[in-house]
Amino acid sequence: MTIGVMLINTGTPNAPTIEAIKPYLSEFLMDPYIMGAPYPIRKAIVSHIVSKRPEHTVENYRAFWTPAGSPFLHTSEQQAHLLQEALNSNSDNRTYRVVLAMRYGNPSISSGLEALRQEKCTDIVLLPVYPQNVKVCAGSCFKEARKQLKKLEKQGWKPPIHEIRSFHDIPAYRNALKEQISQYWTCVPGSKLVVSFHSTLLSDIKKDPTYLNQCRQTREWIANDLGLPSQDVILSFQSRFDSRAWLSPFTEQVVKDQLDQGISDICVVCPGFVADNIETTIEINRDLRNYVENVSAFCSESKGGKAALNPNRRATFTYVPALGCNPGLIEALRIAVTNATD
C-alpha cells in the first residue's frame, strides 16, 4: 500500500525577472478565490495589474533570491524530503511518497499528481501547509487538486482523497513555535511580541470565522507556552492587497503604535508561514525592521503622561524565522498525515 502525500504551498515565480513574474502573478490573481469578481471584470483588472505591478516587485524578488535560486522553494523541497523520511521511518505496513506542489507556478499540482499516479498510490493526502485554515488558500488548493484528479480518472486512477485543512492544534507544532521563538528572542520588561498572520478579506471572515478563531487561538497558546502576559502578545495581520476591507489590525500599524507608546523592544513572529518567503523576508524582516531601527524609540519614563523621546536610544527589532525544516514542524506534518489516513 503506497500513500501519496502532496505538500502544497502558494508558489513562487521561476526566476526574479519581469518575464517570470508576469505569468505567475496572472495565474495567482485570476484565481477566483483570490479575486472574486466576475471573469470579464477580473480579467480586465488583472491585465492592468500585471502590466504595472511586476516592475515594482521585481527588485524585491531579486533581493530575496540567492545564487541557488528561491530560498522558499529550496526550503519547501527539503520539507517534502524530510516528511517522506519521517513517514516511512514510522510506518510498518505502508509506504509513503511525498511530492511538493505549488498552487501557482512550479512544480504544479498537475505534475505532482501525475507523479503519484505513476507511483500507483492507493490513497492521496492533500496537505496545504497552512497551519491555520485560511479558506482562500487551502480551499483553492483543494479545488485545483480535485480538478486535476478528475482528469486522471479518465486513465483509470481514482484513489480515495484525504484533505487536511489545518494542523495548528497539533502539540508538535505548538512546541516547535515555542522553541523557535525562545531561540531567537528573550522577553525583557517593556518588550512586545507581535504575532502576525497573513490578512484575508473581512467579507470571507464574516462568512466563516474559522481562520480568525485559529489565529486568535495560536496567539493565546504562544503567550501561555512562553509564560508571557497576554497584553504583551499582540495579534496582527499583514500584506493586505488592495483597498477593500481586510482583517486587521495591520502589523505595520501595530508596530508603529507600540513605538509611539514607548516600547523599545519588538519581536515579530509569523506562525502562518512554514517557510520564509517574500512577505516575511522583505516586508517584515527588511522593510519593517528598517523602519523600527531607524525610528528613535521612546523611554519607558513619561513626562506629563507622554513618553519622552530619547534620541540616544533606538528600538530593537527581532524577526523569528519561519519553522522551515524544524523537526517539530516535520513531526506535526507527519502526525497530520497519519491521522488523516488512520
Kindly give the residue locations of the regions a language model identified.
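Active-site-proximal alpha-helix that buttresses catalytic centers in soluble enzyme cores
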Residues: 1-342
